[in-house]
Curated annotation (Swiss-Prot):
Protein name (record): Hemoglobin subunit beta
Molecular function terms from GO: haptoglobin binding; heme binding; metal ion binding; organic acid binding; oxygen binding; oxygen carrier activity; peroxidase activity
GO CC terms in record: blood microparticle; haptoglobin-hemoglobin complex; hemoglobin complex
Alphabetically ordered keywords of this record: Heme, Iron, Metal-binding, Oxygen transport, Transport
Family designation: Belongs to the globin family.
BP-aspect Gene Ontology terms: hydrogen peroxide catabolic process
Lineage of the organism: Eukaryota, Metazoa, Chordata, Craniata, Vertebrata
Originating organism: Hemitrygon akajei
CDD domains hit by this protein: Hb-beta-like
Length: 142
């Protein structure tokens, strides 16, 4: 399991306090749906409307950002705290690679948001955090 340093935890918590959670999450979802179209296969209820401004994307963004907020609140217990969520994702057949792809699109959004201050150190912290989340969400898969 990925472990974040104290500095990385501090950075992740600071970023989460600074950004508009729902907006950045909706943008990351839009980007993952556009760049990796196969990730939309479980979102037929969105009827092909995958823009960050579309209501279905906004609703899913709300769920994702709440889960990320919970992870950030207790970074030492992400895997334990995501056990139920991991099980739900396994039941509906979410490909575990999608979690990694969403993490990548979040990093793109962070780089766009922070432009000059998203340097290698910050990128590494974000990368490790989203890897931690992806591993935790994949933990109940057999």
């Amino acid at each position: 399991m990925v472990k974040l340093s104290e500095d990385q935890e501090h950075y992740i918590k600071g970023v989460w306090k600074d950004v508009d959670h729902k907006q950045i999450t909706a943008k990351a979802l839009e980007r993952v749906f556009v760049v990796y179209p196969w990730t939309t296969r479980l979102f037929s209820k969105l009827q092909g409307l995958f823009s960050a401004n579309d209501i279905g994307v906004q609703q899913h963004a709300d769920k994702v950002q709440r889960a990320l907020g919970e992870a950030i609140d207790d970074l030492k217990k992400v895997e334990i705290n995501f056990q139920n969520l991991s099980g739900k994702h396994q039941e509906i057949g979410v490909d575990t690679q999608n979690f990694k792809l969403l993490g990548q699109t979040f990093m793109v959004e962070l780089a766009l948001h922070y432009k000059k201050t998203f340097r290698p150190k910050e990128h590494a912290a974000a990368y490790k955090f989203f890897r931690l989340v992806a591993e935790a969400l994949s933990s109940n898969y057999h």
